[in-house]
Amino acid sequence: MPSSVIMFTFLALTVLTAVMVGTSEAVSCMDNKNKPVDWFIVYKLPQDSASSKPVIREGYGQMYMDVNNQALKFSSTSLKDDDHAIAYTVDDIYKNHGKGNLAHVMYNDQPPAGEEIQSGLVGHTKGVLAFDGTSGFWLVHSVPKFPLPASKSYNWPDNAKRNGQTLLCITFKYDQFEKIGQQLKYNYPGVYDSDLPSKLVGKTPSIVDLVKNVHVTSPPWNRQLNLQSKSGQTFVSFNKASKWGEDLYKNWLATHFKSGLYCETWQNGGRNLNSSCEAGLNVYNVKKVSLSGGSDFKGTKDHSKWAVTTKSGLKWTCIGGINRQTSQMYRGGGAVCLENANVHKAFYDSVAEYEPCT
């Protein structure tokens, strides 16, 4: 057989394979250069009209770190634009809309305008799942009305300019998504947009359950699970149902890690939980955050949800969606934690002031 025919046959098979598999590249979190990355963290900064940095004045400033750049640094790229890690990551959903080669689920207790979520008391939880038959990402975040459904395109919502937010993106192999779905059934997420091609969800029935409004209805009311990122980093998912009825931070994370915590959560509502100092596990509410190279701000301007261990030698950081408020004890939700000295340092060192125990 002539070499030209062999080459043509090879190229034809390559193209056919790409079409059959779906997306040309495995689905992944993307970094600020639009390259696949195992995980990244974005700390969206509160709007500050007095800042010397235009993006912070406008309410679109961000700090960024990832597995390859393990220091939380200010990025001059505006979240309003589409050339940064968050936009690059969710763009896979938009560009593959209607093609049947990508599964996705968007959930948010405060969905975008015009979108509906399930009836009932859904969990206080926000995130995005997307995967093909090889890999995908889980974006855990605190941003109301984000992102827009797959039929639209990336846009940072105007309502999210004012306050601080946190976003954690993790890349997983396909086999982890059934486990993630099982965890999220405790959260009772408010799903407002989804696409689950049958060829991709045969091994992820729990993801299908999320879209069908199936959630945990019998004890135990909380569950933790180790998840492995695509590159082998262990993340621990802590998820609770509304009937668990306790504070995620004091009654679970602190006791699990056998450590005190600094907790930054939204406390602008009523019936806030005070800092707690019991049994040597001091759980402090952060009152002021100072991010080197970014900005300083009060907790009242920060809608993010994170916690760090305070015990010497422990380097755990948790990012999620639950606040330290009485009402949140009776809402589904959770946090995802990782043990990483650099991530821990970034968040631990940002604590400029905390509420003492009384």
Swiss-Prot record:
Family annotation (Pfam families): DNase_II
Tissues of expression: Venom gland.
InterPro entries: DNase_II
Residue positions with a glycan: N274
Reaction(s) catalysed (UniProt annotation): Endonucleolytic cleavage to nucleoside 3'-phosphates and 3'-phosphooligonucleotide end-products
Principal location: secreted
Catalytic activity, EC: 3.1.22.1
Subcellular location: Secreted
Keyword entries, A-Z: Apoptosis, Disulfide bond, Endonuclease, Glycoprotein, Hydrolase, Nuclease, Secreted, Signal, Toxin
Signal peptide: 1-26
Active site: H303
Any one GO biological process: apoptotic DNA fragmentation
Molecular function per GO: deoxyribonuclease II activity; toxin activity
GO CC annotations, alphabetized: extracellular region
Subunit structure: Plancitoxin is a heterodimer of alpha and beta subunits; disulfide-linked by a single disulfide bond.
Family that this chain belongs to: Belongs to the DNase II family.
Record's function text: Hydrolyzes DNA with an optimum pH of 7.2. Is potently hepatotoxic. It induces caspase-independent apoptosis (on rat liver cells) through the following procedure: binding to a specific receptor in the cytoplasmic membrane, entering the cell, entering the nucleus and degrading DNA.
Name of the featured protein: Plancitoxin-1
Organism: Acanthaster planci (Crown-of-thorns starfish)
Organism lineage string: Eukaryota, Metazoa, Echinodermata, Eleutherozoa, Asterozoa
